[in-house]
């Protein structure tokens, strides 16, 4: 405890603030701005594929918009079916299962629960692997110029 209060809490906030300033954008957190862009892209692709309107919302396990807040927003919008896709491609008890736990903690308080689908992992999905390969190729193409 002396180490925490004596050294860590006196030095870490200043170092962390400097690191955050380096990656923060005009939109704020890069995680949030990237998540919003992914959400918009997924909404567009799903609406094309399903030929109709689809609600796609971003939720964060340890941040805002939170999982409970987002689930309530979908419920209030009249969602009858929810598909939850964690952005962790591989399953892990500390990440994917933790997000599932947060979702379950919220839903167990509801009187009526919509139809629900949970995508547990997709690291070995051919479409995901191809997308990673295309992204890697684009990145290395830009780096080698």
Question: Where do the PLM segments sit?
Answer:
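Active-site-proximal alpha-helix that buttresses catalytic centers in soluble enzyme cores
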Residues: 1-145
